[in-house]
Amino acid sequence: DRSSAASDVYKRQEYVMQVAQTIKEQLVALTPMTVLMSWGIKEFAATLYRDLPALRIKVNGRLHAGYVIVALNGSDYYEVYLVKGMEVECVNEEVCFDELGDVIDRAIESGTDKAEYDKFCEQERQNLYVTVVTV
């Protein structure tokens, strides 16, 4: 029956939208704003990825520019993928909601070497205060 199939598609779309909205809300609520801003976020979009409801985030981070996909799997964990062109890298397949910001940040912005990232940030801060004088 055609109306039943259309209703199923609509319900699936609604579910994907709700999951994507929940992921976004959790990310924004639990990740410091300065960290979110460092990712250079351009857009959020609800999507299906590997037949899982997901949030696609367009980012311009220090270590990754492209898309981050956060998908909710059947075990109620998030799977995090980095996508650049046709290349896909699975960052982690078992991420709890409260770890999401840290997992994404390590993958796209700060990396695993805290001292190196702190040095980079300090250099960037100093660059903001340098005045260039031209003759």
Task: Describe the function of each predicted region.
Residues 15-62:
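Negatively charged, low-complexity tracts enriched in Asp/Glu with abundant Ser/Thr
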Residues 8, 15-18, 69:
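Detector for intrinsically disordered, low-structure N-terminal pre-sequences
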Residues 15, 87-135:
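Mixed-charge, Lys/Arg-enriched low-complexity segments
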Residues 1-13:
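Single conserved hydrophobic/aromatic residue that forms the stacking wall/gate
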Residues 7, 27, 31, 104-111:
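Hydrophobic, Leu/Ile/Phe/Ala-enriched alpha-helical segments that form helix-helix packing faces
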Residues 64-95:
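Intrinsically disordered, low-complexity regulatory segments enriched in Ser/Thr/Pro
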